[in-house]
Amino acid sequence: MKIVKAEVFVTCPGRNFVTLKITTEDGITGLGDATLNGRELSVASYLQDHLCPQLIGRDAHRIEDIWQFFYKGAYWRRGPVTMSAISAVDMALWDIKAKAANMPLYQLLGGASREGVMVYCHTTGHSIDEALDDYARHQELGFKAIRVQCGIPGMKTTYGMSKGKGLAYEPATKGQWPEEQLWSTEKYLDFMPKLFDAVRNKFGFNEHLLHDMHHRLTPIEAARFGKSIEDYRMFWMEDPTPAENQECFRLIRQHTVTPIAVGEVFNSIWDCKQLIEEQLIDYIRTTLTHAGGITGMRRIADFASLYQVRTGSHGPSDLSPVCMAAALHFDLWVPNFGVQEYMGYSEQMLEVFPHNWTFDNGYMHPGDKPGLGIEFDEKLAAKYPYEPAYLPVARLEDGTLWNW
């Protein structure tokens, strides 16, 4: 089944998405997501100028061979741009293969391992009271796992805080320059346990409670924080410290039993190897769009299963609905599933990407349409051209550049 066309689309129905569409000689099409927030045009160029021409004439069924060709053939292996491009190709080819087999992707992968995919939502607020109101709203929607972030007294901005009450959190700022945010570790460490205490006192322990530290702490600060919140029985603390220094997670492990989730910025199994092998984390957060697609994620998940590490895939709305659809198929199948992040999408976004998934009482299902179960409206997408936007940077209160 030869590939006859490979096209790249960059569209901004509220935020930028990079979509790959592959067409075979039989007229079967497959979609892949290559979105890399703040660096979308780099990936689009990598696909358009380098990978797409080399797809023409290839057998779409030879997914593994194509994956290896683009990974090993590049010589400059790994990295977010290369791996996001490979991920999109892989995703689109699995979409084609499942459509050719006339079955949903999760069936082609080996069938469902569960009835539905537990997803976690994001709650936020400028104050504890606002965060509690947002928590209650998501609780009423049926979510069983809820991430809680909040504005911190004495800090004008912080990660995870929406720009207005009831609005979804949107980190990227449109324009040619990123927003600069200030950070105070001591204010954070003093305040955040008070937020968790308020949540548990009001809502109890019925829902899984999650929190994202977003790489802000040093190893010893992360250890101190994890120990201080053990009574609140967190589902996980996410990205407590930059994961480039993987050895430091031994120190964190020595001081706290709060579960740890890491990996949303990882691009391959090699990035995950030490943390998984030494059981320094409990959840691996790699995502289909950045870690090699279905093929790459299967390797990571299989390796993680040997060490009882579960998946908790990154899934914010700066990954397109194509990624979300693929992730739900993967999550429904993968044996060592933990949870899936789900921020949701605007009506405008879902008009460009008509989908087939469903949400019911805290669980999602990808649907049973052949392939990924998602479409792409090219004409509508063309009405939303690319708009420059960048993720923020963080500085300490004295002006020192810090980890955002």
Curated annotation (Swiss-Prot):
GO terms for biological process: amino acid catabolic process; carbohydrate catabolic process. Signal peptide: none annotated. Pfam families: MR_MLE_C, MR_MLE_N. SUPFAM superfamilies: Enolase C-terminal domain-like (SSF51604), Enolase N-terminal domain-like (SSF54826). One of its GO terms (molecular function) is mannonate dehydratase activity. Induction: Repressed by RspR. It comes from the Bacteria. Belongs to the mandelate racemase/muconate lactonizing enzyme family. Probably involved in the degradation of homoserine lactone (HSL) or of a metabolite of HSL that signals starvation. PANTHER family: D-GALACTONATE DEHYDRATASE-RELATED, STARVATION-SENSING PROTEIN RSPA. Overexpression prevents homoserine lactone-dependent synthesis of the sigma S factor (rpoS). This is Starvation-sensing protein RspA. The lineage of its organism: Bacteria, Pseudomonadati, Pseudomonadota, Gammaproteobacteria, Enterobacterales. The gene is rspA.
